[in-house]
Regions:
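Metal-dependent phosphoester-hydrolase catalytic domains
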Residues: 1-4, 82, 218-235, 240-370
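Structured beta-strand-rich core segments of catalytic domains in phosphoester-bond hydrolases
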Residues: 2, 73, 79-190
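Active-site flanking residues adjacent to catalytic metal/cofactor-binding acidic residues
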Residues: 8, 77, 187, 238-239
């Protein structure tokens, strides 16, 4: 019984306009910053036109990226609401692939911008086996205190024990695939932005992700039992916003790029891997092919890393030992520095920076659920 599973940070699938750039220049789009805008009304009119004009190209490319996964079930991050997801699926994705993702759910999580996690599935796999979404449960309201995960590091950041652990949500989805049980845990962890006190963004925010990762593990162990969790059919999918290794980029297009594999001493998602709790299937690929995101702050700081994960229970990973994931890179912009031999055949109309499918690459894998 096989299921094609994918995860994709679709990057701001919004149904709202953001006019924050009128009062905060740091939030203003670079295209609008070229022009003299006299008042807020004029700014809002221009921002609407800019957003709508770019969105059509962007969502065609996002749909192409999802279509390329050939997935039966897709986990999404950064979705505004169910209306936005329905409009995207019908207006863009359905027109490309026909047989639609009829079952959809969008979480109402804790993100301050209102970007949530979502799941959509077909009614049956591409091989004709029924997919039943039996239940969907949110863990957005779980606090540090409830799971005993509050630490001195979190307190130093101003986070109290009574506060919610997940910055978005951990969505628990119970499925039957051809009569076989399968549980999906979908998450989008705290971003690595916002360094303070002399620390970079990744290091400063790491305690939050450590707690989120530990909470996901605790939720799974509480559900299946600590001793039995390894034997059950489950997967963790999503943008976990941290990496355990990366490809550091040096050089330039004139003298040639150099790519160095670097393994990190610690990561915010380490609790998920301690004692072999789960298996990162992307690590079945060669080291320099595991990346799902290109990060840059100019020539002095560039790397490729994995932020997007499909993590399988040990039993499920063992039953799929011979399978490897696919990372869809055709939607990446031309500014992404890609190692030799990995250059994708990009989708039509991809730009240097935009339009693009997303800043993230979808990850997909066929899994035998037995």
């Amino acid at each position: 019984m096989s299921l094609r599973l994918a995860t994709f940070n679709i990057e701001n699938l919004m149904s709202r306009f953001d006019f924050g750039g009128f009062r905060n220049e740091l939030l203003q789009d670079r295209a609008l910053s070229l022009y003299k805008i006299d008042n807020q009304k004029e700014y809002e009119e221009l921002e609407r036109a800019r957003t709508i004009g770019l969105s059509d190209d962007t969502r065609q490319l996002s749909a192409l990226a999802i279509a390329a996964t050939r997935a039966d079930l897709v986990c999404l991050q950064e979705v505004d609401n169910i209306e936005a997801l329905r409009a995207f699926e019908y207006g863009y994705l359905y027109k490309m692939i026909g047989r639609g993702y009829r079952n959809k759910h969008v979480s109402t999580g804790n993100d301050s911008r209102g970007i949530d996690v979502a799941v959509m599935s077909r009614e049956e796999t591409r091989h004709g086996q029924p997919i039943e979404m039996k239940s969907v449960a949110s863990h957005a309201s779980v606090t540090y205190e409830q799971l005993g995960l509050h630490t001195a590091e979190l307190a130093a950041m101003g986070l109290g024990a009574h506060e919610r652990i997940f910055k978005r949500d951990c969505l628990e989805v119970e499925l039957d695939v051809g009569g076989r049980p399968f549980t999906l845990f979908l998450a989008h962890l705290k971003s690595m932005n916002g360094g303070r006190n002399g620390q970079n963004g990744r290091d400063y925010t790491m305690p939050v992700r450590v707690a989120e990762a530990a909470a996901i593990r605790r939720i799974i162990e509480n559900k299946f039992g600590r001793e039995k969790a390894a034997e059950r059919n489950w997967a963790i999918c999503g943008d976990l916003n941290d990496y355990r290794e990366r490809i550091v980029i040096a050089g330039d297009e004139f003298e040639g790029f150099r790519f160095e594999h670097v393994r990190e001493e610690r990561s915010g998602i380490d609790p998920l891997f301690a004692d072999g709790f789960c298996v990162n299937v992307v690590e079945r690929l060669p080291e320099k092919e595991r990346w799902t995101l290109y990060h840059t702050r100019g020539p002095e700081e560039r790397h490729l890393c994995q932020l997007d994960y499909i993590l399988l229970s040990p039993a499920l990973a063992a039953r799929n030992e011979g399978r490897k994931p696919d990372i869809i890179r055709q939607g990446q912009p031309f500014r992404t520095v890609i190692p030799p031999g990995q250059e994708p055949n990009r989708f039509p109309r991809i730009g240097w920076d935009r339009p693009k499918a997303s800043d993230h690459c979808p990850v997909a894998m066929t899994i035998d659920v037995i």
